[in-house]
């Protein structure tokens, strides 16, 4: 499976492709580097995101999971940048419980592109399995808020 690794402010990231679609984004450096046009495009869009120049991604993705997890991940993709929803909010949309939404979030194969960092507990941030955990989640949420404020788009202060 072609994959491309690169440095980011939240650590090294590896994006993988199968059949012309992004199938995973993992923390760490991948062993089997094979650049493709799509992987370069993904890397460039992620760099622009981290540079505060982009909030949305225009990439074909194909997360692999159970039908329930796929419903949860679809619900995450409609949360606007700079905003959050609670696990319970997502459960109302996708079905199941807040706890099952947390399980689907933890199994998200394409974090950042599928913005599981925008889901929070009703009494705080909740958890985050990517990078350094909660500091990474805080960083991503703060980055989106700063980008919105700098671009003057709705949702900025």
Outline where the language-model segments fall.
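Residue-level detection of the helix-turn-helix DNA-binding "recognition helix"
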Residues: 106
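Short Lys/Arg-enriched helix C-cap and helix-to-coil transition segments
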Residues: 112-121
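Basic nucleic-acid-binding alpha-helical/helix-turn surface characteristic of O6-alkylguanine DNA
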Residues: 1-96, 143-157
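…primarily DNA-binding HTH/wHTH and HhH modules…
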Residues: 123-157
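Structural signal for hydrophobic
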Residues: 76, 116-117, 140
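Short glycine-/small-residue-rich flexible loop motifs, especially phosphate/cofactor-binding loops
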Residues: 88, 102, 138
């Amino acid at each position: 499976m072609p994959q491309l690794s690169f440095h980011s402010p939240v650590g090294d990231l590896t994006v993988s492709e199968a059949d012309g679609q992004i199938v995973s984004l993992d923390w760490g450096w991948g062993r089997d580097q094979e650049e493709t046009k799509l992987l370069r495009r993904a890397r460039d869009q992620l760099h622009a995101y981290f540079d505060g120049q982009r909030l949305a991604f225009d990439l074909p993705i194909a997360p692999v999971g159970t039908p329930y997890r796929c419903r949860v991940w679809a619900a995450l993709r409609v949360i606007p940048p700079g905003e959050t929803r609670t696990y319970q909010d997502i459960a109302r949309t996708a079905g199941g419980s807040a706890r099952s939404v947390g399980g689907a979030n933890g199994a998200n194969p394409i974090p950042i592109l599928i913005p599981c960092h925008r889901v929070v507990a009703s009494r705080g941030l909740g958890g985050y399995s990517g990078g350094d955990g909660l500091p990474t989640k805080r960083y991503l949420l703060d980055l989106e808020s700063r980008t919105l404020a700098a671009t003057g788009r709705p949702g900025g202060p």
